[in-house]
Amino acid sequence: VRTPFCKAGTTFKGFSAQKLGSLVIRELLDRSSIDGDLVDEVVLGCVANPVEAANVSRVAALMAGLPENTRAYTVSRNCASGFESVTSAYEKIMTGFDDVVIAGGTESMTNIPLIFNEHMTTLFSKLMKSQTAFQKMKTVLSFRPHYLKPIVGVVCGLSDPVCGLNM
């Protein structure tokens, strides 16, 4: 079971990675007639884990109605994330550690955040540390418009930090 591919910012723009993952998990369980209580673990790959769901697999599993005692973890290996989750599940089943594992991937490229640059985060930090009205005013007045230029999370996350190539 999978969701269809679509361009970022279009059909699924209102769906978070955890929501997309939970929909697929729920549909898989419904189609297969597997009781959720039998699922030992959920392993999902996700390139850009949402900040509000750091372990997106766990959140998706719970949103899909799996019991709280179901183990879940997220794999983050850029383009290999989903494949790694499947091979990890396979290994656990083959070694007898688990009997039923749900594995796959989830992603919402639309919802990868824009990030404040170093100038802006430094300004926020100084503002939080300012104790007097004068210190706060001095910090605010040091603001420059270029501080608002964001770092595009999806571009940053999909570029190799060593060689700069797009992954």
Feature annotation, model-predicted:
Residues 1-4:
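Short polar catalytic/cofactor-binding loops
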Residues 7-36, 53-54, 61-167:
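Acyl-thioester C-C bond-transforming condensing/cleaving domain
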Residues 38-45:
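Short glycine-rich phosphate-binding loop at a beta-alpha junction
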Residues 46-52:
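Glycine-rich phosphate-binding loops at beta-strand->alpha-helix junctions
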